[in-house]
Design a protein with these regions (language model features):
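AMP-forming adenylation/ATP pyrophosphatase catalytic core
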Residues: 2-5, 9, 13-43, 55, ...
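Non-catalytic, surface-exposed connector residues within folded enzymatic/regulatory domains
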Residues: 76, 106, 203, 207, ...
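Contiguous mid-protein beta-loop-alpha structural module that forms a pocket-lining wall or clamp
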Residues: 176-261, 265-268, 279-280
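Core alpha/beta nucleotide-donor-binding catalytic domains of modification enzymes
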Residues: 10-215, 244
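Tryptophan-centric aromatic hotspots in well-structured domains and transmembrane helices
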Residues: 78, 119, 221, 280-281, ...
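Hydrophobic/aromatic-lined pockets within catalytic cores
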Residues: 148, 218, 282-286
Length: 457
């Protein structure tokens, strides 16, 4: 831990540094609460000190949050240190404990970062602003790491200064400030901070870059950190333009409220715009983005395949399917047992987890399933094959398979659509039709049956 006696006042020569209260206040959007992600390190401590000085000028309250990853032996000491600093500054302190253990093939650094941001996103109060101490050198390192991994513009844009996080915003006000300037400020103002010993372990990519590669590069290209951070800003501008174009293409290619894309409309776009739109579409659906290889598989198999084919491209947490002219994105469908049966009284929505949806009923008049038919004796089943029915208003029985084709039901959904039975008679196909003789007419009370995908968890 770096120890020093705290100075009693805060002064910064604004002609030489952007580390001033005035500059920081210009960065802050209006919010009811401002939080500092306080690790105890020099960057977040400097940020906390500046905001503590500015607290009377803030439109909202100020507090600090510390994330204990419970990985290193010193974690408990760091937690105590952060709490002590906040007590001295009379700043409310909040603690989050997470399990940041790495999974197979994942680096400890990445695991800790993922766990930290997940916990912060889930916890952050509505409309609050969370500030972090990441600076210009961090930005330069992030850009280089992304470049070494072959990232596109999104990765090369590195860390945005202002972005959404959970129900609030994430702000990085130090991205124009160098590590050297922050250290100079901290020493001048006699701050005390903790040092993570793992920061010197060059087995980790970022540490290797920081300890060995960047110093060598900076000898040949002075000011490299500032230049790389500026390059990241240029990439961020390109991302904004690409997002604007994708939004326009989405409006032109989106077919329905379900958000599926028209294959024929996609084919009118250039390959670059197709890729751009597909990423945007998946992002809007809240799904993890695929690799470039998988993105090309989507283009090759979904856009160029036979019209009657039903291709599937999947990756962890997401899948893309095609039916006729529609491209559909979704979370992976759960395993389904079509032999399962359920009893339902219509009063409450029925969650059919294994079918991947929710069955519900809305009271209507003059339509839907007649209420007095088999009340309390409804069986919910699934297609076994060979079912036939006569939809209300039709003169003949039809195979359910043919009706699904007529209705445009995607083939992967057909075995999951709930079939409503009364005394072994098929009386309704949820979300599609009521059978002849079981529909409410004129002023009769009825039930409109809806079948919808399970909300994403």
């Amino acid at each position: 831990m770096q120890h020093a006696t705290r100075g009693c006042c805060l002064t910064v020569n604004s002609s030489k540094s952007k580390l001033t209260v005035a500059h920081l206040l210009q960065k802050l959007p209006r919010a009811p609460q401002y939080w500092v992600a306080f690790s105890g390190g020099v960057d977040s401590h400097t940020l906390l000190q500046l905001l503590a000085e500015a607290r009377r000028q803030l439109p909202g309250s100020l507090a600090a949050v510390h994330v204990n990853h419970q990985i290193q032996q010193q974690s408990g000491d760091w937690e105590i240190h952060c709490r002590s600093v906040c007590e001295e500054l009379r700043i409310p302190f909040h603690l989050l404990r997470v399990q940041g253990k790495a999974r197979a093939g994942e680096s400890p650094e990445a695991a800790a970062r993922t766990a930290r941001y997940r916990a912060l996103a889930e916890w952050l109060p509505t409309n609050a602003v969370l500030t972090t101490g990441q600076h210009q050198d961090d930005q330069a390192e992030t850009l280089l790491l992304q470049l070494f991994r072959g990232a596109g513009p999104r990765g090369l844009a590195a860390m945005p200064e202002n972005s959404a996080l959970g129900r609030g915003r994430l702000l990085r006000p130090f991205l124009e400030i160098s590590r050297k300037a922050i250290l100079s400020y901290a020493r001048e103002h006699r701050l005390r901070w903790v040092e993570d010993p793992s920061n010197t372990d060059t087995r980790y990519e970022r540490n290797l870059l920081r300890q060995r590669i960047m110093p060598e590069l900076q000898q040949h290209w002075p000011g490299l950190g500032k230049v790389l951070a500026r390059a990241a800003g240029h990439q961020a501008d390109q991302i904004e333009l690409a997002q604007t174009l994708a939004a326009l293409d989405y409006r032109a290619c989106c077919r329905s409220e379900s958000g599926c894309l028209s294959v024929s409309a996609l084919l009118c776009l250039s390959p670059a715009r197709q890729r751009n739109l597909l990423r945007y579409w998946l992002e809007q659906a809240g799904l993890p983005l695929p690799s470039r290889v998988l993105l090309e598989r989507i283009r090759a198999e979904m856009l160029s395949g036979r019209q009657d084919a039903s291709p599937l491209v999947h990756w962890p947490g997401a899948e893309v399917r095609r039916y006729r002219d529609g491209l559909y994105s979704m979370t992976p469908l759960p395993p389904h047992d079509p032999a399962r049966r359920y009893r339902w009284d219509f009063r409450e929505p029925l969650s059919l987890d294994q079918a991947g949806g929710i069955l519900s009923a809305t009271a209507v008049t003059g339509g839907g399933l007649r209420v007095d038919d088999g009340a309390g004796t409804m069986d919910i089943r699934f297609r076994q094959g060979g079912e036939a029915l006569q939809p209300a208003g039709r003169h003949y029985h039809h195979r359910l398979k043919k009706l699904f084709q007529e209705w445009g039901a995607p083939d992967w959904e057909r075995d999951r659509v709930p079939l409503v039975y009364s005394n072994d008679a098929l009386i309704a196909v949820a979300g599609f039709c009521v059978c002849e003789g079981f529909q409410a007419t004129a002023e009769q009370a009825g039930l409109d049956l809806q079948w919808s995908r399970m909300p994403e968890s």
